[in-house]
Regions:
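N-terminal glycine-rich phosphate/pyrophosphate-binding loop and immediately adjacent elements
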Residues: 1-78, 188, 222-237
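Glycine-rich loop(s) and the adjacent beta-strand/alpha-helix scaffold that form part
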Residues: 20, 24, 31-34, 40-41, ...
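FAD cofactor-binding and catalytic pocket of flavoenzymes
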Residues: 61, 220-321, 325, 364, ...
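Rossmann-like flavin
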Residues: 63-64, 68-136
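Helix-loop-beta segment of a Rossmann-like dinucleotide-binding subdomain
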Residues: 94-99, 123-163, 302-308
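Helical element adjacent to the flavin cofactor pocket in flavoenzyme catalytic cores
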Residues: 136-195, 200
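A glycine-rich dinucleotide-binding beta-alpha-beta segment and adjacent secondary-structure elements
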Residues: 137-140, 144, 175, 318-381, ...
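An active-site-proximal "capping" alpha-helix that borders the catalytic cofactor pocket
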Residues: 386-401
Length: 402
C-alpha cells in the first residue's frame, strides 16, 4: 500500500500516476472534498504577524491558485542531481500549459503588457492551465473557479479514485510510523478518533506547513527550521472603468532581475484612495513578488515566524518602484498609486533537498518521501506549481520502477 498525504500539486499527480499504473493507493486529505467555487471558505489562518495564503481542502493551494505554470529552479535542482526536463514536458502537455488566447486578455492586462514592452522590460503573457472554452472571465480565480475552467489537484485526485485509489477526506495525519528505520504506516485522526493505517510507502505532500508538522512528530527535528514564502505586495491605482477586476488574473508577466510583476486585482488598493466614487472597476494593480531568503521557522503548533532580510526588503522595494512606472505608463493616475501590506503566497523550503530528503525525495526513514514545496532548496520567487508537478512526475516514475 502506498499512502499519499495531501491532494495538491504534489499529492494529486502522484496519486493519479500511481493509481493508473495499478498501484494500491490511499490518499488522505485533512480538509473536505468541496466544490471549487467554495474554496474561498477554506483559507488557513495564521498569527496576526504573518499573512500567508494557504488552504486546507481537496486540491490544496492549487484550487485557489491562478493556475500559473512557469518553470523554476531548473539549474538549482540540477546541482542536486534532479533533472526535470522530461517531467516538465509531460506535465505541461497533461495540464495544457499555454499562453491565453487574446480573447481572454482583458483591457487592464493588455495595458500592463503594452506598458512593460514600451519600458523595455522583459514582458510576456503568463503560461497558464486554463481552458478558455469554459472560462467566464470573472476574476475569481483566487476564490475557487465557479466553472472549473482551470486545472487543480482535485482533477488528478478524481482521476486517481476512478482508477481505483481510495480517498479519505477530513483526516489529519499526525505521525509516520516506522520500524527498524523503515516505514510501516501512519497515524491519523478522523471524526475525533485516532486510526492507524499500515503502509509500505508514505509520501508527504501536505504542503510546506503540513508536511513539516508531520515530519517533526515523526522524529525529524530539523524540519521547519527554515522557510521561504515568496513575499509579495500589490501596487495599484485609479484608471476609470478599466474593469480589470473581472479579468483573468495574472495573465501577464514581467521578469526582473530580483522580482517578477504580474497584473493582479486587489480590493485593498481601492481603500487607499480617498474618493467614494472610485469602485473596484476603476482599479488596475500589479503583484510584486520576490525570492526571499530562507530565514524563519515553523513552530510546533504550525504557526510561521518569518524574518525579513535587508535583501528581501530591497528587492520588494525595487519591484514596487518598477510597478509604479508600469502603472503610470499604462494610464493610472500617479497621484493614486499605493501598495497593500506585505504577504506570502508560496511557503516552502522546510524540508529541502540535500538536508531532509535526497535527490529522490526520500528521507532517512526508508520509503518515507516528501513531495511538495517543502523540498525546494531555495525560494523560486515565482509560482512553484509546475515545478512541484514535475517533481511529482519524476518521483512517480521512480516509484513505478521499484
Amino acid at each position: 500500500m502506498i499512502v499519499i498525504v495531501g491532494t495538491g500539486a504534489g499529492g494529486g499527480l502522484l496519486a493519479r500516476e500511481l493509481a493508473l499504473d495499478g498501484k494500491p493507493v490511499t490518499i488522505l486529505e485533512k480538509g473536505p472534498y468541496i466544490n471549487s467555487k467554495d474554496a474561498f471558505n477554506y483559507y488557513d489562518k495564521y498569527s496576526q504577524d504573518v499573512d500567508l495564503l494557504t488552504t486546507t481542502c481537496i486540491g490544496g493551494a492549487t484550487i485557489v491558485s491562478m493556475s500559473n505554470m512557469v518553470r523554476a529552479l531548473d539549474e538549482e535542482l540540477l546541482e542536486f542531481g534532479v533533472d526535470l526536463t522530461e517531467a516538465y514536458e509531460y506535465v505541461e502537455d497533461l495540464v495544457g500549459v499555454h499562453q491565453l488566447d487574446d480573447s481572454h486578455i482583458g483591457k487592464g492586462t493588455q495595458a500592463f503588457l503594452d506598458a512593460g514592452r514600451e519600458l523595455g522590460l522583459n514582458t510576456l503573457k503568463m503560461p497558464k492551465a486554463i481552458r478558455e472554452a469554459d472560462c467566464i472571465q470573472c476574476g475569481n480565480c483566487a476564490f475557487g473557479c465557479p466553472v472549473d475552467a482551470k486545472w487543480s489537484g482535485k482533477d488528478f485526485v478524481d482521476d486517481a479514485v476512478e482508477a481505483g485509489a481510495t480517498l479519505i477526506t477530513e483526516a489529519e495525519v499526525t505521525e509516520v510510523l516506522s520500524e527498524n528505520g523503515k516505514v510501516c504506516g501512519i497515524k491519523y485522526v478522523k471524526d475525533d478518533k485516532e486510526e492507524v493505517l499500515e503502509a509500505e510507502k508514505v509520501i508527504l505532500s501536505a504542503g510546506a506547513i503540513g508536511s513539516t508538522l508531520i515530519l517533526k512528530k515523526s522524529g525529524f527535528e530539523e524540519a521547519g527550521r527554515e522557510i521561504f514564502f515568496d513575499p509579495f505586495v500589490s501596487v495599484g491605482g485609479y484608471i476609470k472603468d478599466i474593469n480589470f477586476n473581472t479579468e483573468v488574473q495574472m495573465a501577464g508577466l514581467i521578469i526582473g532581475e530580483n522580482f517578477v510583476l504580474s497584473p493582479h486585482f486587489s480590493s485593498f488598493i481601492r481603500a487607499n484612495i480617498p474618493d467614494d466614487n472610485v469602485t473596484d472597476k476603476d482599479i488596475l494593480s500589479i503583484m510584486v513578488k520576490t525570492a526571499d531568503e530562507c530565514k524563519g521557522y515553523v513552530t510546533d503548533d504550525g504557526d510561521v515566524v518569518k524574518i525579513n532580510t535587508i535583501n528581501d526588503i530591497r528587492y520588494l522595494a525595487e519591484g514596487a518602484a518598477t510597478a509604479g512606472f508600469v502603472l503610470e505608463k499604462a494610464g493610472v493616475d500617479p497621484n493614486t498609486i499605493g501598495s497593500t501590506v506585505y504577504r506570502g503566497a508560496h511557503p516552502g523550503g522546510t524540508a529541502p533537498i540535500g538536508k531532509i530528503v535526497d535527490s529522490n525525495l526520500e528521507t532517512d526513514i526508508e520509503n518515507l518521501y516528501v513531495c511538495d514545496a517543502s523540498v525546494l532548496p531555495i525560494s523560486p520567487g515565482k509560482p512553484p506549481i509546475l515545478t512541484i508537478l514535475a517533481l511529482s512526475k519524476r518521483l512517480a516514475d521512480y516509484l513505478k520502477k521499484e
